[in-house]
Regions:
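A short, Lys/Arg-rich alpha-helix, primarily the initiator
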Residues: 1-16
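Short alpha-helical DNA-recognition segment
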Residues: 15-36
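Helix-turn-helix repeat elements of alpha-solenoid scaffolds
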Residues: 89-108, 134-156, 186-200, 230-240, ...
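DNA major-groove recognition helix of helix-turn-helix/homeodomain DNA-binding modules
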Residues: 47-63
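Flexible helix-coil transition and linker loops at the boundaries of alpha-helical arrays
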Residues: 70, 106-118, 133-134, 150-167, ...
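"A position-specific structural signal for the A-helix of alpha-solenoid helical repeats
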Residues: 79-86, 118-128, 169-176, 214-221, ...
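Structural motif corresponding to the intra-repeat A-B loop/turn of tetratricopeptide repeats
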Residues: 17, 133-135, 184, 222, ...
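Alpha-helical adaptor scaffolds
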Residues: 176-250
Length: 307
């Protein structure tokens, strides 16, 4: 196996994409840091290296750098926050929120004050978890999400963001912004954001499982919004694409939901038999992967279509 310094790998990919050091590091570090990393004169934090690799769409698990015990603990805490966020979104379990907040506090004790990447992760998580007595209002959530994205993308503008470079967490924030515009009643902006975000991911996503999983998340939300405005043909095509990616990369988090969107679109298009079969697949897939709440929602949706 050929081995090269991580700085050399980053430099090769940056030049392949015709990116300047300034473009790559915007919002997360100084150009001099990139220069020193590429020349092997500096070993930045694991947090920063991961962010750079994500912006370059280079899977971080294929590249190795010396890391300290604290950096490994920070990475572990960040992964736990992501886990509790997903758990809370899927179940609305109060205990998941409690565990997430505890993990925020542990990460804050470990991270440096200037660690914008961890700050952003915590702020995004808080937007998901809401307050003790319920979710934030759409207006409050929008302010939090814009504040979060601009920690590392200071010039972010929702009307033309697709020329930027984004980490995994930044992509999730943009996706959340789109969903929040939907809750604010501005579905046209939500669909526009998801359309451009899906195009960005089509261009930048390589074949690694993690980035493909994020792509299925965006495609599901895009297709779901298209159904809501009556664009059933487009919704079906987008959802099929997401379904095929799930199968291709072996990641099934959004697989039941994509099948359910396809079922709903087929129903509105007058294809009752196809719709019924897809609803059954969606329901049993949700049950099989332990998504009981989603399985129940799919079942209720299927019953409404039969009435």
């Amino acid at each position: 196996m050929q081995e090269i310094f991580i700085g050399e790998a980053i430099k090769r990919r940056r030049l392949e994409l015709k990116l300047t050091q300034e473009k790559l590091c915007e919002g997360i570090c100084e150009p001099i840091t990139i220069s020193r990393l590429e020349n092997g004169r500096q070993s930045p934090s694991r947090n920063l290296v991961n962010a750079l690799l994500e912006r370059l769409d280079m899977p971080s698990d294929r590249y190795y750098a010396l890391v300290s015990k604290d950096e490994l603990e920070i990475e572990d805490l960040q992964a736990k926050i992501a886990y509790w966020d997903i758990r809370f979104e899927q179940t609305q379990d109060v205990q998941a929120r409690v565990e997430a907040i505890k993990t925020h506090e542990a990460l804050q004790r470990k991270m440096k004050l200037e660690d914008r990447i961890s700050q952003q992760l915590i702020l995004r998580s808080l937007a998901i978890l809401g307050k003790e007595d319920g979710p934030f209002s759409p207006e409050e959530k929008q302010e939090m999400l814009f504040r979060a994205i601009r920690l590392t993308a200071p010039n972010f503008d929702v009307s033309h963001f697709e020329d930027g470079l984004y980490t995994a967490n930044e992509i999730k924030i943009i996706n959340q912004l789109a969903l929040n515009y939907e809750r604010l009643g501005d579905q046209s902006t939500a669909i526009d954001i998801l359309h451009r975000l899906s195009a960005y991911m089509e261009q930048h996503c390589r074949c690694d499982r993690a980035s493909k999983a994020r792509q299925t998340m965006v495609l599901f939300n895009y297709a779901n919004n298209l159904v809501s405005v009556g664009e059933y043909g487009r919704a079906l095509l987008v959802a099929k694409k997401g379904r095929d990616i799930c199968i291709e990369c072996g990641h099934y988090l959004f697989f039941p939901e994509l099948l359910a969107v396809m079922a709903e679109a087929e129903s509105f298009l007058g294809n009752a038999k196809d719709s019924e079969e897809l609803y059954k697949q969606a329901f049993y897939m949700a049950k099989a992967i332990g998504h009981e709440r989603n399985a129940q929602m799919i079942f209720e949706q299927m019953k409404r279509r039969d009435e």
